[in-house]
Each structure stands twice: as structure tokens, then as C-alpha cells.
A protein has these predicted regions:
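Acidic/histidine-rich, surface-exposed loop or edge segments in extracytoplasmic proteins
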Residues: 7, 12-17, 301-309, 462-466
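Generic alpha-helical structural element
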Residues: 200, 290, 313, 317, ...
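Conserved strand-to-helix beginnings and helix N-cap segments that scaffold or border functional pockets
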Residues: 96-97, 276, 462
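A structural detector for beta-sheet-dominated domains
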Residues: 6, 255-257, 264-269, 306-308, ...
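Acidic, metal/ion-coordinating pockets
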Residues: 1-272, 315-327, 337, 472-476
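Short, glycine-/Ser/Thr-/acidic-enriched flexible segments
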Residues: 54, 117, 142-143, 187-188, ...
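A short C-terminal boundary segment appended to hydrolase-like catalytic domains
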Residues: 256-352, 457
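Feature captures C-terminal
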Residues: 2, 14, 26-30, 106-113, ...
Length: 481
């Protein structure tokens, strides 16, 4: 018997092959259309989504504002008979009501072994019986969510350690399953080889490597969260993570008679353009309503502030970045502003639509104002300046921001002050000066800085903000502001 397993993760609501500006070779409809044809070649199939499914695109932003009985994204996955779902950290961004609306009707398919208090019932694992060959799928979500998420969005929830929870269920799984799959919205914190050398701070955000080090009962780890792209074997365990936004997906084939296992990441850009009509019809009305919403003009500039080269914009500044800083400063009243320019940033034409805003700022981040000393501000700027390196006389990007996962979003620019960094100097000694209104910023004086809730809370990236007093919270999405 041949069983095919398909895994998607971090789709972020990308259904159509578009980023809502240009056509792109990605998205659920292309993946699903392939699966519908491909699964006919096998005796049985198993379809698993590993989270960050219903947040992260213009479509999901639109859906979060609507009163809907059934989330069309979930409806689409159900149309091709997905068997199991894992919750991702971004599933909580729009609050528990949105989460419940999306998953309540399919809660019997949600596998969750480490979140307590969800507004719907889930099971820690499911066992799928294929003519006596039993595959167990246990679901986990990164425990690091409380470090990012607004408290109101995870009220009364408890996030339990992944490794401890697997240990709790391991005996049951071994007794009842021939093949154990960990379905994990989290990634690998160490190198993808037998050495397992740490590649990031060991914060428990990602515990895939820790699972491999502690258990020999796992046959496969289907991961997500990090937006990496790989499929490999570590300690004889298949480990996979498909690219985000539906750019690739995992395919594994198990032959129960020969015990042969084949595996691959399927590159969606190499699939044909055929999309199943019945699947597409599920989204037809939603797409029409979305396009009307996205095309609404909401503002106008005297001239365009388009971003042609995002690297140069990060390096030298740009009117678009200045505008974002001014928005944060105006709405907060803070002395300074810190923000990341997202990879999707394209800037604005003279006329601004809802589409333009959501392309440039796709995340539902809110703002916080912190008290910082001039010394803490300098520490934050020094950290950000490690993004740049000089190699062979040319300015480039520090590999720590590129591997093991791309992290351009961890480079911040700063507004409300004039500052200069010298890239020829060593890390953490690059700030030449910091001035506000023409005067040097005092290292001892207390100022205020506005930044998004993610940066304010996740101080492992910018430790300068650790312990800083929160003086104001602006609980409105930046895209709405």
C-alpha cells in the first residue's frame, strides 16, 4: 500500500497566485489543484496544515473585518479533505473570536498537545488507520507566543513546553502507531545535521532539534514558523519545512509493504497554471468583495514615495520610511520612533488605496510607547547596525540576518532624531552621534520611543528594551492608523 502525505504550512491566507499587486507562482489554489490530481496515483492520502493559515495577507485582513459564518480559507482546505490542522502563532493575531470562527466547525481535526484553554475542543493527536498501518499525528504550537501576542488575544490560555508534552504522550503513540509524525508550528533551533550546532538563541521558540535529541520514537517532523525551505533526514528522521505563502509544500510517500519512503519539497512555481474550477468557485464572491475593498482610495500625496530598492532604503533612508516614522510619532506623541521596513514594502504612489497600505504593512501590529534612556536608545541602534557588513569593500548584509532563516524584519530604522553610524567600525561601536533638535542626546536622560508591540515584547532580539516601562499602548492596528 502506498500512502502519500501532503503538508502545507504558513500559507498566511495566500489563496490565489497573487500578492494582490502582481501575479505570483504561489498559493493554495495551485497546491490544491495539484493534490487533487496527484493523490489519484496512491492508495491513500493524508493532508496536514501546520499553522499560520488564516492571517498574514490582504485577504485575511479583509476577512477579519467581516461577519462571516464560515471562513472561506478553511472551507477551501476542507473541500480537498484535509485531515489535520495545527494552530500557528499568527492564528491569534485577530483575537479568540476570529480564531474560534475559523476553527470551531473543524475542531475535531485540530491536533493540539500543548495549548490549554482554547475556545473549542481539540485532541492532542489523531491516529489514522490505513488497512492496519497506523500513522499517529501529534500537534504542537510554539510556546513563545506570550512573548509576542497581545494579552487580550491569548487571555486564559496556557502554552506548555513541547518536549515535555511529547514525553507525556510518547508511550500512547508508540503503543498505538506504526509511524509517528510530529506536526509542529515551530522550527529547528540547531543545524540540520547530526552535529546539531545551535543556530539561534535557545529560547524555546523553536524546539525541533530538542525533540530529535530527546526521543527516538519520532519518524517525521513536519515543521513551520521559520519561513525556511528544506526537507532532509536527521538521525533517520524526515524533517521538513515548506516555504511560506504557498511557495512550496511537502510530499512524502510511504510504501507499507517495502518500507520505502520517498520525500520532496514541491516547488509551486514549477507547477502548471491549471486551477480546479470547483475549488476556485468557493472563493469567487469573496474575491469580488475583496477587490472592491482593496481598490478604495483613502488618501493622496503631492508626489509618489515609491521604494525601488529596499536595501538602499534601509541603508540610506527613504521618504516612505520617514512617512511611517511620522505616523508613529504623531499618533503616539513619543520622542523617537523605531520600525522595521517589511520585505513586501513598495512605498506609495500619489493616490493611496487600501491595497497599498496592506501590501506595505501586512501585519496587525499595534504600537507601544516605552521609556528609554539615551544609552538604551544607542544600544538599540547599535544592535540594528549589525545588519550591515563590509565585504570586499562593498556594503552587504550580515549573514546572521539571512541564515538559518531570513530576518530582514529584525533591522530597524529610527525616527525623531538625527544619527550617524560608521560601518567601518566594530559591531556595537558604530554610532558616531545622536542628536535631537540639533543637540546631543544625553545618555542619562529619559526619553520615550514608539515601536510595534512585537518589538516591544520580544526583547530577545533587542535586549535594550528589556524591563523598559510601558507608558502608553495604542491598541489599533498600524494598517488602520
Amino acid at each position: 500500500m502506498k500512502i502519500v502525505i501532503y503538508q502545507t504550512s504558513d500559507l498566511h491566507g495566500y489563496i490565489y497566485p497573487t500578492n494582490y499587486v502582481n501575479d505570483q507562482p504561489l498559493g493554495f489554489l495551485k497546491i490544491a489543484s495539484y493534490i487533487l490530481n496527484d493523490e489519484k496515483n496512491y492508495d491513500a492520502s493524508l493532508k496536514i496544515d501546520c499553522g499560520d493559515l488564516v492571517q498574514g495577507s490582504a485577504l485575511t485582513h479583509f476577512l477579519s473585518k467581516q461577519a462571516i459564518d464560515e471562513n472561506p480559507i478553511i472551507k477551501g482546505l476542507e473541500a480537498i479533505n484535509y485531515n489535520a490542522y495545527v494552530l500557528g502563532n499568527h492564528e491569534f493575531n485577530y483575537g479568540l473570536n476570529y480564531l474560534k470562527n475559523a476553527y470551531d466547525k473543524i475542531s475535531d481535526k485540530v491536533i493540539n498537545a500543548n495549548i490549554k484553554g482554547l475556545p473549542f475542543n481539540t485532541k492532542p493527536y489523531k491516529v489514522f488507520d490505513f488497512n492496519g498501518f497506523k500513522i499517529g499525528c501529534i500537534g504542537f504550537t510554539t510556546v513563545y507566543i506570550p512573548n509576542w501576542e497581545q494579552e487580550a488575544n491569548i487571555k486564559d490560555l496556557e502554552f506548555l513546553d513541547v518536549v515535555k508534552q511529547y514525553a507525556k504522550y510518547e508511550k500512547e503513540l508508540k503503543e498505538n502507531c506504526d509511524f509517528i509524525i510530529v506536526c509542529y508550528h515551530g522550527g529547528f533551533e540547531k543545524s540540520l545535521d547530526e552535529n546539531m550546532t545551535p543556530t539561534e538563541a535557545l529560547t524555546k521558540e523553536n524546539q525541533g532539534s530538542e525533540l530529535l535529541e530527546n526521543f527516538d520514537s519520532i519518524n517525521m517532523i513536519l515543521s513551520g514558523h521559520q519561513h525556511r525551505s528544506f526537507i532532509t533526514k536527521i538521525k533517520d528522521v524526515i524533517c521538513s519545512q515548506p516555504m511560506h505563502n504557498g511557495q512550496s509544500f511537502t510530499k512524502v510517500v510511504i510504501d507499507t509493504e517495502s518500507n520505502d519512503i520517498s520525500y520532496e519539497l514541491v516547488d509551486v512555481s514549477k507547477l502548471n497554471d491549471d486551477i480546479d474550477d470547483k475549488l476556485e468557485n468557493i472563493f469567487t464572491q469573496t474575491k469580488k468583495d475583496l477587490e472592491v475593498y482593496l481598490d478604495k482610495i483613502i488618501g493622496e500625496f503631492d508626489k509618489d514615495i515609491k521604494v525601488d530598492d529596499i536595501f538602499l532604503a534601509r541603508l540610506k533612508g527613504h521618504p516612505f520610511i520617514n512617512f511611517l516614522h511620522q505616523v508613529q510619532l504623531d499618533v503616539s506623541g513619543a520622542d523617537f520612533s523605531a520600525l522595521s521596513v517589511f520585505d513586501s514594502a513598495m512605498g506609495f504612489s500619489k493616490k493611496i488605496s487600501v491595497r497599498d497600505v496592506l501590501i506595505n504593512y501586512p501585519y496587525p501590529n499595534t504600537l507601544k510607547v516605552l521609556e528609554v534612556t539615551g544609552e538604551k536608545l544607542k544600544e538599540a541602534i547599535e544592535k540594528s547596525a549589525t545588519y550591515f557588513v563590509i565585504e570586499d569593500g562593498k556594503i552587504g548584509i550580515n549573514k546572521d540576518f539571512l541564515h538559518p532563516k531570513v530576518q530582514h524584519y529584525n533591522y530597524d530604522t529610527f525616527g525623531g532624531l538625527e544619527y550617524k553610524i560608521d560601518l567601518s567600525r566594530d559591531f556595537y561601536d558604530r554610532v558616531v552621534y545622536m542628536k535631537k533638535d540639533g543637540e546631543d542626546i544625553s545618555m542619562d536622560k529619559i526619553y520615550t520611543i514608539v515601536l510595534n508591540n512585537y518589538r516591544a515584547s520580544n526583547t530577545s532580539i533587542y535586549p535594550a528594551y528589556k524591563g523598559c516601562k510601558v507608558v502608553k499602548e495604542i491598541n489599533l492596528d498600524m494598517s488602520e492608523i
